[in-house]
């Protein structure tokens, strides 16, 4: 889809456009409204929905067999070093951090 076509679709139905775009991620509970402008200029997106960000950013990639693929790449031009963290490694690190936060009563 070309830029003009995407822009025209957004212009014709902004609410529908963003709800369609929201379909690209997995939701715990799907949104029925895209933009909440009731407190403008403090806008809120997808206020009637719930999402697990870790699932969308990490877990689903491991489940899909991409655990050994890079999730984060740090390539430092200053030190000349490159460090990669795979999706599986990131999942483990996130789980350990969540466990530590829970043990401290923070979550």
Predicted feature locations:
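Conserved catalytic residues of ABC-type ATPase nucleotide-binding domains
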Residues: 38
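Extended carbohydrate-recognition surfaces in non-catalytic/accessory domains of CAZymes
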Residues: 44, 48
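Conserved AMP-binding/adenylate-forming core of the ANL superfamily
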Residues: 54, 72-107
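A short N-terminal helical cap/helix-turn-helix that marks the beginning
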Residues: 11, 16-32, 49-73
